[in-house]
């Protein structure tokens, strides 16, 4: 970092961050001797500073990556390189050498070579896959982008955990907690280029409707019988539950502008 930062005050602050002990859930403190804790707020910042040198190598107009017409997409220490498949093994070996020179190693479990026409690509919670579609006599390829099954499963698990054994909670409190969860998820995944977000939202609505029905039934109150007929729609109408289709449409339009 000293090669890229000249402000001694900032360097001192980063040094304190890196050497501060890590506090575990049980209250114990563990000394930090190397690296940054997983999920720490400073980790993405340090990754961006340190890997800026790698970005410059990849984007060098006269460099090996540019000559092979390879592009990079990077988020912190998680990156994709896209280009012609026949360059892939040569480029991968080159990346290994670059990382070694930087004192880093690639995660072999996460490092893969994929042909976009044959395999789905999973990145930052999204699934990218190549789809063939017929337009008249012609068959064209296009990229299908949608929230991955893993991302959807995580949302379902959080909803299940939220609604399980919460009989004592009021409807207003449940609506508030569910809205928090849905807004966070939709803010991330509602992007104009996500081609199948609406199909995903329909599935989420059905899942949420079923979970709300089970929760209301578990409370066993007569006052909830009418609400149980169409729990999702009724809670949207009478209790302010988020209309996820309407919200996603507004977010998609806002991000497209």
For each feature predicted by the language model, list its residue ranges:
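A glycine-rich phosphate-binding loop feature that marks nucleotide/adenosyl-phosphate handling sites
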Residues: 72-75, 111-119, 177-181, 198-207, ...
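Extended C-terminal regions of large enzymes
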Residues: 204-207, 216-257
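A conserved non-catalytic segment of reverse transcriptases
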Residues: 19, 102-168, 181
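Core structural elements
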Residues: 18, 23, 172-188, 206, ...
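Long, highly charged amphipathic alpha-helices
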Residues: 53, 57, 90-97, 154, ...
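Short, solvent-exposed helix-loop connector elements
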Residues: 30-36, 142-144, 160-174, 186-199
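Conserved polymerase palm-domain catalytic core
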Residues: 1-109, 113-116, 120
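Short secondary-structure subsegments characteristic of cysteine-rich extracellular domains
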Residues: 192-217
């Amino acid at each position: 970092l000293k090669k890229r930062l000249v402000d001694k005050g900032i360097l001192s602050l980063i040094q304190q961050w890196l050497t501060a002990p890590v506090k575990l859930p049980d209250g114990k403190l563990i000394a930090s001797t190397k690296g940054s804790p997983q999920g720490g707020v400073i980790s993405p910042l340090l990754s961006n500073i340190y890997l800026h040198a790698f970005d410059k190598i990849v984007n060098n107009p006269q460099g090996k990556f540019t000559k092979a017409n390879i592009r990079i997409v990077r988020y912190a220490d998680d990156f994709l390189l896209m280009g012609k498949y026949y360059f892939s093994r040569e480029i991968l070996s080159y990346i290994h050498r670059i990382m070694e020179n930087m004192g880093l190693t690639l995660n072999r479990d996460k490092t893969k070579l994929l042909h976009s026409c044959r395999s789905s690509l999973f990145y930052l919670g999204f699934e990218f896959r190549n789809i063939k579609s017929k337009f008249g006599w012609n068959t064209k390829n296009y990229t299908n982008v949608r929230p991955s099954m893993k991302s959807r499963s995580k949302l379902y698990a959080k909803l299940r955990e939220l609604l399980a054994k919460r009989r004592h909670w009021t409807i207003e409190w449940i609506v508030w907690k569910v809205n928090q969860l849905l807004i966070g998820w939709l803010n991330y995944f509602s992007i104009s280029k996500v081609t199948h977000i609406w199909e995903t939202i329909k599935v989420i609505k059905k899942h949420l409707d079923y979970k709300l029905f089970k929760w209301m039934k578990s409370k066993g109150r007569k006052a909830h019988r009418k609400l149980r007929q169409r729990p999702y729609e009724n809670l949207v109408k009478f209790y302010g539950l988020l209309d996820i289709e309407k919200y996603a449409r507004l977010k998609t339009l806002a991000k497209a502008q």
